[in-house]
Structure formats: C-alpha cells, structure tokens
Amino acid sequence: MSIDILFITYNRPDYTKLSLKRLLDTCDDTMRVWVWHNGTDQKTLDVVQSFRDHPNFFEFYHSIENKKLNEPTNWLWKNAPGDFLGKVDDDCLMPSGWANVLREAHVDVPQFGVIGCWHYFEEDIIPEYANKRIVRYNGQHQLLQNCWIGGSGYLMKRQCVKDMGLLQANRNFTNYCIRLAAKGWVNGWYYPFIYQDHMDDPRSPNTGLKTDEDLKKHLPLTAKNTGSYSLTDWLDFLHKDALVLQSANLDPKYYLGLRAKIRKFRERIFPLKSSIIKESEKI
C-alpha cells in the first residue's frame, strides 16, 4: 500500500538541506515525496533542486506567492494516488522507519484516521494526564488519543479525504482532524512515541534558534500567532501546548456546533470562571 508525503519549503535552506534529505532517505519504493515551494528564496530553491534526482522525490511545484499550508495540502490530496497521505515540515527530522510503523498500524486498525509522530520532549509529558488516554487497539498498537494532532509527521488514510473532502479556506488542519473525530475516526500519536526532531524547538540539538535574535529572524508561524517573541516565551508555549494535547477534551462535539459557541461565549463573559471550569474538565 503506497504513501504520498507532502513537504513544504519556504525560506529555511539550512533546515531544508537536513530535513528533506532525511525524509527522502526514510522512504522506501512504496513512498513518494511531493515538494511544494512557497516564495522565491533562491538558496532554499537550490537546496530543493539538488535533491530532484533522488528516487523518492516524486513531484515539485513552485508557487511564487506564499500559499502557506491549505493550498499545498489540497494539491497533494487532490493529485496523489496513494492509500495513505502524510506531511512533514521543513523544520522536522524524521526517524528511520516512521512511515512503515504508522502504515502498519493503519492497516491493522481500520478506525485509525490521523496518527503521527511526537515532537515534544520527555519533560513535556505529564503521566497523570497522558496515561489516561493511551489506548491499545487490536492487542498490538497503542495510541495517545486526541481529537487532533500536529501537521508534521502524520499519516492519514485516503478514506478520510473521501469522507471529509479537502481543506476549506477558513479551516485549518486542527479543525479538519476534529471533524474527522466527530465522524468516528480515531486520531492520536503512536505509542511508545515515534520521536521526530522539531528543530524549531530551542531544545533540539539541531536548532537554529539559539538566541532571541535568531527567533525574531526566523520566527515560526506558531510563535508569531501566539506572540512568542523570546526564547523563554516560545519554550513556555511549547511546554503548555504539550500539556493541552495531553489534557484536552476527547469529545469532538465539545469543539463543534452550538456547544462550542456557548463555551466561547462563556469564556468571553466569565473568563475567570471559565479557566476554573477548564481545569475541572481535563481528562
């Protein structure tokens, strides 16, 4: 059963040189890597072109305009023929065999929807939260369940796209995963964890973010969206993000429809009470 993997590049030539080579080298002859380049950074383009002859480099698309994530993702989903669809970010180094493990789990467990690799650190794992949501399926595959997972190092059944369609312009991958969960698909991180090295985590041995100035120069999109403009703030966000993923409500209806609207209204009107309720709702 074949796998198609999206790899998006932008303006990080040093990261791309490491991450694209690693991704290509982790693939076998049943896997195809589709590279989409956003923008006109020539150094990054040169790095991408240097890998064009690799046997696992399947397709390349260059968008002069930065189309970010949704359009490249839909490009893969519309055109790729594989049984499984994945994505790896240019700031992530994948471990050997990662896609094979996830594919085997998908084949053995029909209800798995989006499953993936973990990129947080040991210090980010809170056993009293995580252990409650690690579930074994078919006697052999374990998953740390959540309604959504991150957008790098995942593998998704093609049937998910048949069920849900493409990413809509006003919705992100997190929302897509939640809606899949609402349809009965099971999402989460394979356990024991398959670790991908997130180089934009300042704790990574391969990070390019060693000072606050490095962070400002190469500000990750998530850091920008969360107002994390110093290494201290960025590390604090990453740790809290891992906590959220281990404690978030497992009922997808909590995030959708009328219940979600009521919850957002309640949080806006009664912020202190809402924070207390959130703590009590942790699973």
Where are these regions (language model features)?
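N-proximal low-complexity "stem/linker" segments adjacent to membrane-targeting elements
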Residues: 1-21
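A conserved acidic beta->alpha catalytic loop
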Residues: 36-47
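C-terminal catalytic/acceptor-binding lobe
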Residues: 167-283
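Short beta-strand-to-loop acidic/aromatic patch adjacent to the donor-nucleotide binding site
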Residues: 82-93
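Short, acidic, metal-binding catalytic loop of nucleotide-sugar glycosyltransferases
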Residues: 21-30
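A recurrent flexible, glycine/aromatic-enriched loop bordering the glycosyltransferase active site
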Residues: 70, 121-122, 136-156
